[in-house]
C-alpha cells in the first residue's frame, strides 16, 4: 500500500549505508526510523532525546543526549517538526564534540508518497484500544506541547458532546502524564499512549474515526458505515468534517501551511480554540476547558509555606531554558525578567515571587521560591493561587488561564489573535509582530535581529506598570 509522509528522511544529505543517530524520538524521529527500516538506506544506531526516560522501549536504543560522546556514528539527523531548537541543539552537539557538518536537519516538506509493504503494521501487543470496546471508537493524535493538550481538550469535549457513547484514545509523544492530569475528569477517555507516531500509524485505520490535531485538524480515517450504525447525525457531521478539511486546500511544507492557516483564521475571526468552526461542523463559542485538581497534592501545596500573597513567573523555552542568551525569538529577554523582579520587589516587598519552569531552567535573581521540574499536579495549585502570572506565550499561560489566574503575556513572533486569551493582559511593542511560521521555528526573527524588536521592546517598566495597575484594581 501507499502511506504519506510529511517528514521525508533527508536522503539527499546523508550518504547511503551511513550509521546514524536520530536526535528526537517523537513523530518525526519515528517516521525516519520507519523509513530506514523499510528501505534499509541507513543503519539507525540509536535515538538520543532529552526526555529519553519517558519513552517505552523501542527497536533501537534511546539514550540521553550526552551519550553522543561515546557512540559510534557517521551523522546525527535532527528529527524536529519545526526549526525552533535547531540552532540551540546544534550548538549543544558541537560542544559535545560533534562537527557541524555531521549534523543534518531538513524542515517538513510537501507530503511524499512512499511504498509500504502490507505487513508494516505496528505490533499492538496487549494494548487496551478503544476500537475493542462497544460503541464508537475515536483516535486523536497530539503533538508534545503542554498548552496544546489543554487547547485540544476543547475538541475532545466537543466530540463527546456530539456522541456521548464514544471511547477516545489519545496518541502523544512523551506527555501521557500531562494528558492524564488534564483529562482525568473525562469518562470517555479510554487510553493515552506515549507514542512518537509509529503506533498510531499502525492502528489509526482500525478506529471508527481518527483525527490528527495540531494547529490545524486532519481527518486521517473515518468509517461512515460504522458511524451510521450508532449515530446517523454524528456520521453526517464527520463526513462534512472530512470534506471541509479536504477542501481547505493547504499544500506545501508544514511551516507554510501554518502561516497561511493563522492568517485565514484571523480574517474569519477564529483562534486556536475556535478554528474548527470553519468546517461548519463545530460551534465552539468559548475557550473554557476543565482542569481537574488532584486532591492528594493539596496538603503538599499547603505545606510549601509560600508567602501569603505571591506572583508567578516563567522563563525558558525547553532546550534553551538553561541559558540567558535568548536563543528563542519568542522569549522575553532574561535581563528584562531580572529587571522586572527587581522593580517588583522594590514596589511590593511583602509579595513573594515564585519561579516555575522545567528542571534545567536558569534561576532568576531576586526570586523568593523556585519550583523547577516539579510535579504538574503541584504546579496547578501554585498557579491557581497566584495573584498574576507573567510569561511569554506558552503552555503555563494556557494552564494558568484555565485555572482562573490572570496572565500578563509578552507577545512577539506568535500571533496574539490566534494564541491569545482576551481575558489576559496581552502585551505587544515595536513595529512588527506575528512572523511565527513565516520562517521555520521559534528561534528565527524574520528581520534577522539578534535582539528581536518585538520582544526586546516590551520593557520591564511597562510590564511593571501593567502588574501594578492590575494589583491596584485599575487594569482590565
Question: What is the predicted role of each segment?
Answer:
Residues 241-303, 423-476:
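Leloir-type glycosyltransferase catalytic cores
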Residues 325-413:
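Donor-binding and catalytic core of enzymes assembling or modifying cell-surface/extracellular glycoconjugates
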Residues 189-290, 306-326, 414-417:
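Conserved nucleotide-diphosphate donor binding/catalytic pocket of glycan-assembly enzymes
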Residues 43-50, 167-175, 354-356:
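Short internal beta-strands
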Residues 32-34, 140-163, 337, 341:
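Histidine-anchored nucleotide/phosphate-binding helix
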Residues 17, 122-135, 296-313:
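Nucleotide-sugar donor-binding and catalytic loop/hinge architecture
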Residues 282, 288-355, 462-470:
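Core catalytic architecture of nucleotide-activated donor-dependent transferases building glycoconjugates
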Residues 1-121:
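Hydrophobic, well-ordered beta-alpha structural blocks that scaffold small-molecule cofactor pockets
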